[in-house]
A protein has these predicted regions:
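Glycan-recognition and catalytic cores of secretory/periplasmic carbohydrate-active enzymes
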Residues: 1-201
């Protein structure tokens, strides 16, 4: 279909232009609207243009896992596996696997975490574990993330105000949504729980 072709073209161009040699990604690619050539590469919500913004890495892992699920194209599976390797072998990933908001923030370990990046990553890993020969490791990482979120990042019952998890970071460079609950963190937490349940049934 037309939409399928558009999605595949978008995925391929993103794989080509968003990612660095180490499989970390930029946040925003500025394309020339006439030629389609890349004009600039930015990391708008990260620490710096060449840094690895944590939620951006999580989106990449999630996105290419979904691309493989929908197409069966093993290039997308490889991309997802390489992004996972970047994340989980990064020297600035904390031992509880809940990332700082940007892997290259020089204020680490004093910089805020981003629980939303962790929940997106966990949900992606559960899905990826069903397709990859590294699935056992991916599920183990996802389980560790979910256990630590449940034990250390839940909003107390009497303070929830509609949220499940605290300590997400939306847009630190703009000074907004820093170390707070964010609704999409809760969404991907619930999605991850459902995927975990389905895997274990």
């Amino acid at each position: 279909s037309t939409f399928y072709k558009i999605a595949v073209t978008h995925a391929d161009n993103t794989m080509k232009n968003h990612f660095r040699k180490d499989y970390s990604s930029y946040h925003v690619i500025d394309y020339d609207t006439i030629t389609g050539n890349v004009r600039n590469k930015h990391t708008h919500q990260g620490y710096a243009h060449e840094s690895a913004w944590a939620r951006g890495q999580a989106w990449g892992l999630y996105g290419y896992t979904m691309c493989f699920r929908e197409t069966g194209d093993r290039r997308y599976l490889n991309q997802a596996e390489q992004i996972a390797s970047f994340i989980f072998h990064h020297p600035n990933l904390p031992s509880d696997l809940i990332p700082y908001w940007d892997y290259n923030d020089p204020e680490i370990p004093a910089s805020p975490r981003d629980v939303s990046a962790a929940t997106i990553t966990a949900s992606a890993l559960y899905e990826l574990s069903a397709y990859s020969d590294k699935g056992g490791q991916y599920k183990k990482w996802a389980d560790t993330i979910m256990e630590n979120l449940t034990e250390s990042y839940r909003v107390p019952l009497n303070q929830m105000h509609g949220f499940l998890l605290h300590s997400s970071t939306g847009h630190k460079p703009a000074g907004t949504e820093i170390d707070v609950p964010i609704v999409y963190a809760d969404y991907y937490f619930l999605e991850a729980l459902l995927r975990k349940k389905n895997l274990e049934e």
